[in-house]
Amino acid sequence: MGIIAALVVAAFIVYPKVQASQRAQAESNNIATIQAGVKALYTSASSFTGLTNTVAVQAKIFPDNMLSGSGTAAKPINAFKGNVTLAAAATGPSSATGSSFTITYDNVPAAECVKIVTAAAGNFYTTKVGSKVVKAADGTLDVAATAAACNNATSNTLVFTSI
């Protein structure tokens, strides 16, 4: 009886961690898909000016499992029920309007934050957790700063900038 009780307790401890890892992996894949979709959409354009969630939804950039609602009312959300926002930015090397774009992920729990950032940041120009830059332009990811920033809040906003 004691062994069964120990197994049940272990399952309750391990299962949430496995679930968190699976959600983090799925969201890392979604971020890569979104980035690739935006770059493909704007291949022939001179900048990312005009990029919005509406444009991205109409161009089918977001994976279907991320969309809440349908048609023009579809809104991208992540696995944590946080908003996902695409926007043109002026944070590329030239600092020109539309020289870069951002993918913003809201409401990311601390348990998944580090896993998502460490999996995705290498493909981006810069990465922020909240207001903390954890990967500077042309730099490498600061894993210690990422862990500290992610664990500083129960719900995090991640901003990935791509050029």
What are these language model-derived features?
Residues V18, I31-F48:
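N-terminal alpha-helical signal peptides/signal-anchor transmembrane segments
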Residues T43-I163:
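Periplasmic/extracellular, small/polar-rich flexible segments of pilin-like filament-forming proteins
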Residues V9, K17, A36, K115-T118:
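Generic detector of well-ordered secondary structure
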Residues M1-R23, E27-N30:
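N-terminal single-pass transmembrane signal-anchor helix
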